[in-house]
Amino acid sequence: MSRGGKMAIVEINFDGLIGPSHNYAGLSLGNLASAKNAGGTAQPRAAALQGIAKMRANIALGLTQGVFLPQSRPDRAWLASLGCAPETAPSGLLANALSASSMWAANAATVSPAADTEDGTCHLSVANLVTMPHRSHEWQGTLAQLRLAFANPAFTVHGPIPAPFGDEGAANHMRLSATHEAPGVEIFVYGVTGGPFPARQHIEASKAVARIHGVSRAIFVQQSEEAIAAGAFHNDVVAVANERVLFAHELAFADKDGFYRDLRALLPQVEIVEVPTAAVSLTDAIQSYLFNAQLVTL
């Protein structure tokens, strides 16, 4: 939108609508809630209505809201590439083909607004999600929806980073700025595999996205191994940001002091709200999804 010759910057929140194949198959290694609920009875209709209610609540607050539609499931093309069909697939493969996890919009893409990029356009890179089989075939459907939603010269939509470099999208990316319109600092959080669970975001993928988007004010931060081992399979399970506020657990980052120092140097206005372990343990933070929330600017 243009106001006085200038582009108006609007923050848009996207949610994914759960599909009818929603089920609890326990497919997500490192996601303790997924493992705990494996085999449970899913209620796709109730879940979809909950999601719609949440989106309506955002709209009632005056926020701009978008939606990702459910993808076609089972993914017959993915099964065909593995030499089978839904009727003949082993139960494990069929469960992966039926997954409705594309609803998790935080894993759809990494977004760099125009104020942060060299060419002055908003860049979006669809996440490849290669670490988990049930999510590795989502990107084609997500990319098609991104290209439809952002079919405007003000936006540049990119395909996925190639395997084997894992990219999990916005769940491992944060942006902080004095205001949404101002140039910001983009924070790419990556993991290092070595514990009981895989690190899903690779630093190679994070740096590639930053280069492709033309982002120069970027900080690459390692997620703490302790957080990953405790079940923080994405950074957004232990940290969340909006505008100038960073809300994070004390044990979210491997070198929080260095990260906070670099962040304050680039963005003196930043407000860091850190929750100490003495107040909320990592276990409680992950089980409650305290940080896996949405911060908005009203």
PLM regions: where:
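Histidine/cysteine-enriched polar flanking segments
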Residues: 1-298
